[in-house]
Every structure is written in structure tokens, then in C-alpha cells.
């Protein structure tokens, strides 16, 4: 399995424009022909192209410098130098491109095949034929080609998913993802099994499909860089809503309501916009709950707060079909609301 890398810094440079030529016509019966130096070719651009066949920025960890081809110099007989070839770099769909110096977002590549020029090639210099005037019919100079643009840029990958699974480590998100989809994330009964986001596709039928992302477990102070969560919070930003998974197997270890509120605090501290994302609550591990009456109390609490509540066991499959329908219903509700706002 390829290593997941979601943030890199690379250097890009457009090709230099070719120099203009200094040349004169030399024909049999015109020993003193006019200026005939052609223009230099344009330098190649550096272009990023989004592709769904890539899922990580790992390649850029090993190669940091990307320079497009230079334009060729102009030639005699007013012949134009060949343009430098553009350098095409493929990046995963969902890549945000920023200027490393200013932090300005250059482009956000969210669609298959979307392109972004990150460094333009320099213009070719004009040949001496361009500088002929009535008073100077034989200019002996031409223009140099311009340098290509160069800069350091930051590539940040934000996964594109419809639903983000969030919750503390060990809430059972990976097992839930494998139940809902065909994804096969690492699953073990200890915190931080998931070291990178996992994506899976939930198919209710051929028309109803949702992409679900399992975001590695957050802990308190994740927004400050504690644990693993801070590295992956950006992946939640593109989701339409969150499925907040809480572990109800052992109320003594971490009270579910406290766990829910602690995670929401982290989202709020990282980005107030994130905390406002719609959420549903998924109470997981009900198979290990000895007193099921506690579930009714939890459901009452969350419904009073305005959250939809689903009780499931990712391990046994109990409640999973109801959750699938609930996820789709929530997705449709948000999608319809967004469509209404656009029109």
C-alpha cells in the first residue's frame, strides 16, 4: 500500500525564452540582404493536472525541483525558434496549490483533468528582423529571451468525500467504514491503528453511492498538533457532513457525551467553519453494552440537541442498514438545500 503523504513543498520554474537571432539575407544576387533574424521560441510552462489515479503526494517527497524546457533560439531566414515543451505534473484530485512565500491559494484542483499553470515560460526574444526601421535598415542586435517564472509552491491534499467519520481513537471508525463500504482499512483494538485517512464507497444501489472518509482518531488538543488528528483535519473540510462516532461499550472509560463534546471543541478550535458542519451521531459497539437502557437516555439527549441518532454494532452488523439509509437521507437533504441556494 502506498504511503500517504498529504503536504509537500516543491520548486517550479518555467522554461527560458529562446534568444532572438541576428542574421541577414544572403542570396546570390543580393550580397547585402536585409535583416533576417527570427524570434526565439517561448519557454515551456509548468502545469499541474488533477487525476483520480493518484491518491498521495508521495512522489514529491523524492523529487522537489520541476523545470520546463527552454525555448530554442531564433534562426536565419526569419525562422522562429521552437517553443519549449510544457512540463505536465499529475497531482491527486483534491490538491490545493499555494504560494510558499505568501500563502496565497493559486488554485484548487477539485475535478478530473483540471489544469493550473504554476510557472509560466519566458517569452522568446525578438530577432533583428523586428528592429529594422527606415533609418536603421540593418540592425545588428536582437532581444534576449525572458526568464521563466520560478517559485516554491506548497501542495496540500484535501480528500474529496461526501461523509467524514470523526471520533476518538478506538471509537470503531475503521470497522464501521469496512461495514459500510468495501474499504479494507487496518483494524485493531487499540488507538491510532489508522495512521492515514481511508476512503470507501458505500453503495445502496446503482444510483445511490456515497464516498466516506475515515479520518484518523482525534484527541484533545489535536488543533495544537497533539496526536495524529491535526494532520488530517483538513480532509474533513470538503465533506458535506460528519458522522460522529462515539464508543458506548464502556461508559466508565469515557462518557460518550463528554467524548462528543471534546471532539467538537477540537473542530471549533481548528476551524469554526468545521464545527458548523452538519453532523449525525453514531453510537457504536452496542454489542458490548450490558445495559441497553443507557442508549435510550443517549438518544433522548442527542435528539433534543437536534442530532439524528443511530445505534449500531460495526462488529456484528446490527443497525448498519438503518445507518446506511440515514446517511443517504442526510446527504440528499444537504444536497437539495445547496441546490435551492444556488437557484
UniProtKB/Swiss-Prot annotation:
Signal peptide: none annotated. Its EC number is 3.6.5.-. Keywords: Cytoplasm, GTP-binding, Hydrolase, Magnesium, Metal-binding, Nucleotide-binding. Its cofactor is Mg(2+). One of its GO terms (biological process) is ribosome biogenesis. Residues 161-332 form the OBG-type G domain. Gene3D superfamilies: GTP1/OBG domain, P-loop containing nucleotide triphosphate hydrolases. One of its GO terms (cellular component) is cytoplasm. The keyword Cell membrane does not apply. Mg(2+) binds at residues 174, 194. It is found in: Cytoplasm. GTP binds at residues 167-174, 192-196, 214-217, 284-287, 313-315. Its main location: cytoplasm. GO terms for molecular function: GTP binding; GTPase activity; magnesium ion binding. It comes from the Bacteria. The keyword Kinase does not apply. Monomer. Belongs to the TRAFAC class OBG-HflX-like GTPase superfamily. OBG GTPase family. An essential GTPase which binds GTP, GDP and possibly (p)ppGpp with moderate affinity, with high nucleotide exchange rates and a fairly low GTP hydrolysis rate. Plays a role in control of the cell cycle, stress response, ribosome biogenesis and in those bacteria that undergo differentiation, in morphogenesis control. This is GTPase Obg. It comes from Aquifex aeolicus (strain VF5). The gene is obg.
Amino acid at each position: 500500500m502506498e504511503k500517504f503523504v498529504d503536504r509537500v513543498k516543491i520548486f517550479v520554474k518555467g522554461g527560458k525564452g529562446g534568444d532572438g537571432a541576428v542574421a541577414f539575407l544572403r542570396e546570390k544576387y543580393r550580397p547585402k540582404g536585409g535583416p533576417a533574424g527570427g524570434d526565439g521560441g517561448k519557454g515551456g510552462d509548468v502545469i499541474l493536472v488533477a487525476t483520480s489515479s493518484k491518491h498521495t503526494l508521495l512522489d514529491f517527497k523524492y523529487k522537489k525541483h520541476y523545470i520546463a524546457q527552454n525555448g530554442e533560439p531564433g534562426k536565419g531566414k526569419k525562422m522562429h525558434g521552437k517553443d519549449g515543451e510544457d512540463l505536465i505534473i499529475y497531482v491527486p484530485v483534491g490538491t490545493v496549490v499555494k504560494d510558499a512565500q505568501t500563502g496565497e491559494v493559486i488554485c484548487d484542483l477539485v475535478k478530473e483533468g483540471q489544469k493550473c499553470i504554476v510557472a509560466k515560460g519566458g517569452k522568446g526574444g525578438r530577432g533583428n528582423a523586428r528592429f529594422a526601421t527606415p533609418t536603421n535598415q540593418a540592425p545588428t542586435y536582437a532581444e534576449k529571451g525572458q526568464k521563466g517564472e520560478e517559485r516554491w509552491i506548497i501542495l496540500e491534499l484535501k480528500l474529496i468525500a461526501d461523509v467524514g467519520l470523526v471520533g476518538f481513537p478506538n471509537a470503531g471508525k475503521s470497522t464501521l467504514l469496512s461495514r459500510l463500504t468495501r474499504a479494507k482499512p487496518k483494524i485493531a483494538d487499540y488507538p491510532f491503528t489508522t495512521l492515514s485517512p481511508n476512503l470507501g464507497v458505500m453503495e445502496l444501489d446503482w444510483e445511490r453511492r456515497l464516498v466516506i472518509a475515515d479520518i484518523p482518531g482525534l484527541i484533545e488538543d489535536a488543533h495544537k498538533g497533539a496526536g495524529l488528528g491535526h494532520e488530517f483535519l483538513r480532509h474533513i473540510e470538503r465533506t458535506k457532513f460528519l458522522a460522529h462516532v462515539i464508543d458506548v461499550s464502556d461508559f466508565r472509560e469515557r462518557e460518550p457525551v463528554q467524548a462528543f463534546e471534546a471532539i467538537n471543541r477540537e473542530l471549533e478550535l481548528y476551524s469554526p467553519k468545521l464545527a458548523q458542519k452538519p453532523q449525525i451521531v453514531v453510537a457504536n459497539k452496542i454489542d458490548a453494552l450490558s445495559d441497553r437502557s443507557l442508549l435510550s437516555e443517549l438518544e433522548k439527549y442527542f435528539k433534543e440537541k437536534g442530532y439524528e441518532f443511530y445505534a449500531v454494532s460495526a462488529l456484528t452488523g446490527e443497525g448498519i442498514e438503518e445507518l446506511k439509509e440515514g446517511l443517504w437521507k442526510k446527504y440528499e437533504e444537504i444536497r437539495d438545500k445547496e441546490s435551492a441556494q444556488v437557484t
